[in-house]
């Protein structure tokens, strides 16, 4: 019987053995992949996260363009329509944004990329998502540009063009990073 438990921010694997009790597997932490939660105010930490996200999302977009099915395209299109609806109705659309990016990773049909993306969503991606939130709240006029970036990614994937999909995904993430940096530069310093 194996359990995972959270305590003080760390993940441990506990094993129960009849007659022996419960113990922590000493190799689990050493072998477990973890990323510390990024600090939104740390620009170097942000750069490292963005490099990681670029390597994953550009690769995912390229594979999605090669492997996507009609069902995958339908999921992406639904998320795009949801984001468009959110824009028209002055809503954030962050859940639809997540669904769009998730559908791209799922279209790779690579279970390891999907699992890594799920991990990053739970632990890291919120930094990237804050770029969208800040753009929507403070720079509403830029949301149309964000939507256009998403449409470019989708069009390249739909056309089965991995190079264009990779370029569009990279441009989108670089623009998201710029939007986040702009927001951070305008934030008042903590007192």
Predicted regions and their residues:
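Conserved amphipathic alpha-helical segments that form helical-bundle/coiled-coil interaction surfaces
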Residues: 53-131, 149-152, 164-176
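Single conserved hydrophobic/aromatic residue that forms the stacking wall/gate
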Residues: 1-12
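Non-transmembrane, amphipathic alpha-helical segments
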Residues: 41-48, 68, 109, 138
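Short helix-coil transition/hinge motifs at the ends and kinks of transmembrane helices
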Residues: 38-39, 132-141
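A short secondary-structure junction motif
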Residues: 30-31, 123-134, 179, 183
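C-terminal-biased regions
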Residues: 142, 147-155, 162, 166-191
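HTH-adjacent hinge/linker in prokaryotic transcriptional regulators
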Residues: 13-51
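Alpha-helix N-cap/N′ positions at the starts of helices
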Residues: 31, 41-44, 56, 78, ...
